[in-house]
């Protein structure tokens, strides 16, 4: 080149310009270690002027990094309308899916930038494209991120309001680990996302555009049930008044009524924080559900995976849950609306068992027992052993003795409880006062209850086992599957599992 400059300076200059231009063109598309380009960096930083300069210099808008990122995808993630328009003008793909299939429109939908979404849609972006992992659409993303105006735009452009994300259908049990798995199963609709995120405005947009109000997830959970699970009473009222099925149950048999009863007066915590702006109350929703025809005698098919604590076994009714929660107001309401106080669970626990085993202090338990006995609950039903719940069963008297509630004992005797009835371990209530029972939750034998023993004998109890049982160190054996989940007619009250 130096020799050429000395002999033909004009030719040398031309060659320098040509080489420089070539170098410059190659430079604007140079790759970093991750495969990204200067254009991608400019887009990521929102530097429109730099992006335009690079594009004029020949930057390739369609280059993909090693991780599948594109300039358009990066612009969409930030919802940069001007940048998106610049890229579209030079031929960028309006969909620009990443390796997971997420499109630019889906990314923009998450930001809520309606202008950016309009630009992509005008350029031909697919409104109902689904990403590969979750099968979610732009409308689902907009609903999940609480962007009702974005949802209006997408629906106006033809988005499917009833589309569902991928049902992953995870295996719920494996050979080596038999407990139920709490896994995100997918299968959510835009309305389910709105309910999950407590977005009333999003729900209204969908309902105005004829979204199916009862379309559930793969576990049978409806939008109404989700709203109640979140203790979002206002949204629950909105769904009920819009015509939601108040008797829609999930795969466990859990209904909006049972869930509302639990969440209005939940004893074990763990539920969503209640919006202080909620105008409706849990009690108002319970009343509204009953007014709209909710079945007060609906029972659990199985113990729900998302409900903790005792009295959550098969056959549990709304009444039993309300009693266990010491919610006398709802108990009275349910009885007025036709709740059957004679129905018991698959392990034969009655509402009176629930009153004693629940969280009610003794005075409140007594009031509940009086209500239930008047409504027909039999004090002599013998509950069965339930291993998962760590319950040894027995009559209501067995339960009262184990809790050492003397006034409850007197009340039950006045109601005609059989003082000499035996539980499945062959023990009477009097046996329990003699340290012959077993407390599974503590893995200990029951202590000696002298005062309760004296009271029972005074009231007429006479029967004792001939000899105290010898319990294994860890307590009674766990039993076979039929013992754990009793299925026989002898274990199931006739009305159990009859669902309207």
Q: Which residue ranges define each predicted feature?
A:
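Bacterial N-terminal signal peptides
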Residues: 1-6
